[in-house]
């Protein structure tokens, strides 16, 4: 059985669809804070859905004790909101991740953990390499770095964990909220309006298609690689 935390979210739901199409037995854990059941409409009859939070240790333990692997996508992800809800972001993104790592140590399953390019902060050089310094500049990014440090700590105790640092992911079912710039651009173009660009237009961002993010997750889970972080962009 494969567990996908945050499996009703943008990226998680695409991972779930791939796993179901491959024939895997899939359980989704999502509290539907930002995830939506409609994201799972194509596969809802083929997954076991649990409405819950990764901060609920006993609930997690009951799910993962017989698991072959966990795709850990659940997180609070809004940078602006993270300034206002720092305790909540720490509880979910850090404590919730540690719950999964503790259980991975006890039960021996593999974890593919979603991280973020935001851990690098404002990079001094492009392209960014995995070995570059991590210098997060907002509370959200700080929680992702703390989660990475926990993963590194647990990997020293033979927990099989791979971290994927997503850059700006776009694709079907993407929210129009913060950072969904491609979706916003396309909507304005469809309305015969010019894309709205903030600032001087010289800023750059690295984008990655959601299906490519799915491929990265599957390769990470199926590989024999252990205890590494990879950029996905």
Question: For each of these PLM feature ranges, what is it?
Answer:
Residues 87, 186, 205:
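Short alpha-helical segment that forms part of, or immediately flanks, the ligand-binding pocket
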Residues 1-169, 189, 211, 224:
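N-terminal Rossmann-like NAD(P)+-binding domain of SDR-like oxidoreductases, especially those catalyzing
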């Amino acid at each position: 059985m494969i567990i996908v935390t945050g499996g009703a979210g943008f990226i998680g739901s695409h991972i779930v669809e791939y796993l179901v199409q491959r024939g895997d037995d899939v359980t989704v854990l999502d509290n539907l804070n930002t995830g939506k059941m409609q994201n799972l409409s194509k596969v809802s009859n083929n997954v076991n859905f649990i409405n819950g939070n990764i901060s609920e240790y006993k609930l997690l333990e009951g799910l993962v004790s017989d698991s072959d692997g966990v795709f850990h996508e659940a997180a609070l992800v809004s940078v602006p909101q993270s300034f206002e809800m720092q305790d909540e972001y720490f509880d979910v993104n850090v404590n919730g991740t540690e719950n999964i790592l503790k259980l991975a140590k006890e039960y021996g399953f593999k974890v593919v953990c979603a991280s973020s390019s935001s851990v690098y902060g404002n990079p001094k050089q492009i392209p960014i390499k995995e070995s570059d310094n991590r210098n997060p500049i907002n509370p959200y990014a700080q929680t992702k770095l703390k989660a990475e440090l926990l993963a590194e700590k647990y990997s020293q105790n033979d927990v099989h964990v791979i971290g994927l640092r997503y850059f700006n992911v776009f694709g079907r079912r993407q929210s129009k909220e913060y950072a969904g710039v491609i979706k916003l651009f396309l909507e304005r173009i469809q309305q015969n309006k010019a894309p709205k660009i903030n600032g001087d237009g010289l800023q750059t961002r690295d984008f990655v298609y959601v299906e490519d993010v799915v491929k990265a997750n599957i390769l990470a889970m199926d590989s024999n690689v252990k205890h590494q972080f990879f950029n996905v962009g």
